[in-house]
Amino acid sequence: MNQHSTSDKIPKTKRGRKTREKLLHAAEAEFGERGFPEASIASITQRAGVALGTFYVYFESKEEIFRALVSHMGELTRQWIGERVAESPDRLTAERRGVEAFIEFVRSNRNLYRVVSMAQFVAEDAFREYYSVFASAYEENLRRAAEAGEIREGDCEVWSWALIGMTVFLGMRFADWDEERSVEEIAAATSELVSKGMAKNA
C-alpha cells in the first residue's frame, strides 16, 4: 500500500468531500471507542451510513483512513486554536487563549487523545508529523514574538516542544479525564507559570 496516497483520493466535488468527512467522523468514533485492532471498515461504513464499497472510493485500507484521520484531527485542532488566538494583542495572551482553546477542543472531541496516542504504535510517522507540524508553527510564532519584543529571546525550538507537552498533558488531565476545573482557572495558572516562571522572586 502506498502510505501517502490519501491526498490523491481527496474528492473534488462537494458531495464527495461531504462523504469523505462522514467517513472520517465515523472512523474517529470507531477507533476512539474500539481501538485500531478491533475497529473494522464495515463498522466505519455502517456508522457513516454509506455502502461498504463507497469506502474504497476514498481510502485503500483501515490504516490509510487512520492516517488520514490523524492528519485531519491535527488540522481541525490547529484551526480551532488559531481562530481563538488570532486577535491576541501579544504572545503571552495568545498562550493563555491557546490553552483555553485546546482544553475546550478536547472536551468536545474526547477521541482526540485516544486516536493520536494510538498513532504512535499504528503509524509512527503520522504521529511524529502530527506534533512536528504543531511545533514548527509554534516555534515560528515564538521567534516572531521575540523579534517584536513581546517575549525574551531563547531556544524557541525547545520552548515550542515544552509548551506543547505541557498543554497536551493539561488537556489529558483536565479535559479527557474529567472537567472538574474551569478552563479559565487552568489557563490562568498556566499563564502565570509561563510569564513568571517558578523562581520565588520572579
Short names for language-model regions:
Residues M1-I10, E104-S108, S136-E147, M166, ...:
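C-terminal peripheral helix-coil segments that are non-catalytic and often amphipathic
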Residues T19-E28, I44, I65, L69-T77, ...:
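Generic hydrophobic, amphipathic alpha-helix propensity
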Residues K22, E30-E64, A68:
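Helix-turn-helix
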Residues E33-P37, S88, N109, A148:
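Short coil/turn segments at alpha/beta junctions that flank glycine-rich nucleotide-binding fingerprints
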Residues F59, M118-V122:
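Short helix-capping/turn signature of helix-turn-helix
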Residues A68, Q79-S108, W159-L163, E184-A187:
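Hydrophobic alpha-helical connector segments
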Residues E75-R78, E124-A148, E157-W161, F169:
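Amphipathic alpha-helical packing segments from all-alpha helical-bundle domains
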